[in-house]
Amino acid sequence: MSRILTLWAVPRSRSTAFEQMMRARGDHVCLHEPFGEAWYLGEDRRCPPQRSGGPTPGLTFASVWDDLQSRAAGSEPVFIKEFPHYVEHLCDDAFLDHFIHSFLIRDPARTLPSMYDKWPDFALAETGFLEQRALFDRLADRQDKAPPVIDAEDLVA
């Protein structure tokens, strides 16, 4: 299995624009927040209670991970854009070793109003800033160097 090229981001950080650029390259299998549906709608979902609807039968974090590993075993490299708060409960060293890590950051003063415009009733647990920072710090400590970080403002400068 090849390691999965991963952009760790938070909602409304211009991460989907980055993902679209990766898709346009045409040389990666690109997946949009593969664990997000399980976080919100999976049988073992972890989203805030006010977000929970009926679970999707058969959708679990394990089923998403199995699919992702199958894709990574294929002939094309895999890129995912993902939010750390969707997977923080999975992030042991063995899990993290499957990825090549990079981070996209955006000033919360820009991200939070954008979230509010899109989802006025969003919960703090959906912002992901604390989880993104915790994952970054953990990886920097593990690797003895910081993973690459892109400031979203640099993408539009």
Residue ranges and their predicted role:
Residues I80-A157:
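PAPS-dependent sulfotransferase catalytic domain
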